[in-house]
């Protein structure tokens, strides 16, 4: 295990390992990708390669909605902060989305067409198995 006096640094150094301890707090995530929309993502551990389990974080800024899409793998999602809104179908219909506050758990099957967004800044944690891709309808 990496030795560091800073627990966040030590955790980040172990992020891709599946054999070393790792911890992350919502306010101290080492975001690896950011989009102009304000969304951000990070892979905590594992890889998105075929047959590999990985954990990730995804941040959705207040007011953002992602158009209908599906993923190649099932996602097990935990709402860490804020409130995730999600609906199913090929049309973006925010009024049809259900709300899931922090502490909620969701299972989204592979291939399920859905749209998601947030009215408040929201961070989710997820667990899935690769290969991972997002396909927009």
Where do the language-model regions lie?
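A structural connector/turn signal
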Residues: 55, 65-67, 74, 95, ...
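Membrane-topology and secretion signals of cell-surface/extracellular proteins
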Residues: 35-39, 66, 113-116, 135
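Glycine- and acidic-residue-biased ligand/ion/polar-headgroup-sensing regions
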Residues: 61-64, 71-91
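Short acidic-glycine-tyrosine-enriched beta hairpin
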Residues: 47-49, 84, 90-111
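A short, N-terminal "cap"/entry segment at the start of jelly-roll beta-barrel domains
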Residues: 3-54, 97
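Double-stranded beta-helix
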Residues: 19-22, 95, 115-137
């Amino acid at each position: 295990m990496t030795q560091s006096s800073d627990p966040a640094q030590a955790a980040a150094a172990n992020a891709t390992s599946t054999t070393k301890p790792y911890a992350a707090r919502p306010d101290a995530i080492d975001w690896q990708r950011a989009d102009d929309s304000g969304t951000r993502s990070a892979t905590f551990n594992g890889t998105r390669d075929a047959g590999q389990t990985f954990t990730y974080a995804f941040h959705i800024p207040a007011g953002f909605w992602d158009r209908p899409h599906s993923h190649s793998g099932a996602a097990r999602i935990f709402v860490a902060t804020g409130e995730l809104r999600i609906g199913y179908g090929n049309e973006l219909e925010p009024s049809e989305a259900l709300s899931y506050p922090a502490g909620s758990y969701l299972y989204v099957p592979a291939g399920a067409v859905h749209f998601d967004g947030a009215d408040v800044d929201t961070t989710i944690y997820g667990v899935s198995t690769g290969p991972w891709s997002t396909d927009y309808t």
